[in-house]
């Protein structure tokens, strides 16, 4: 049985994220080997990743796919992630995903985390 092409798997994963179907999104991630890395967090569990990303669901408007590059098992997407938040209404993101045997085993997201960090890190009071 042939596995789907890496680009198809990653596209389906992004479709599931955009549709806020996190249960379906989980089916595209490897059960035995998964790692996620971004400027604001990293994790090594697909279940933890889905639990975390599902919290973003309420503010996600759409994922604009600007350009896709494929090299073997690696899929690189240039994305604009649109949210309902004024300060983060369109975040340009580079996402690199590795697909093995039809499952995503690694995702690295690269973006300017300045506004995210302002929400996470408390500001010092003068």
Regions picked out by a protein language model, each given a short descriptive name:
Residues 1-126:
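C-terminal and inter-domain tail/linker signature
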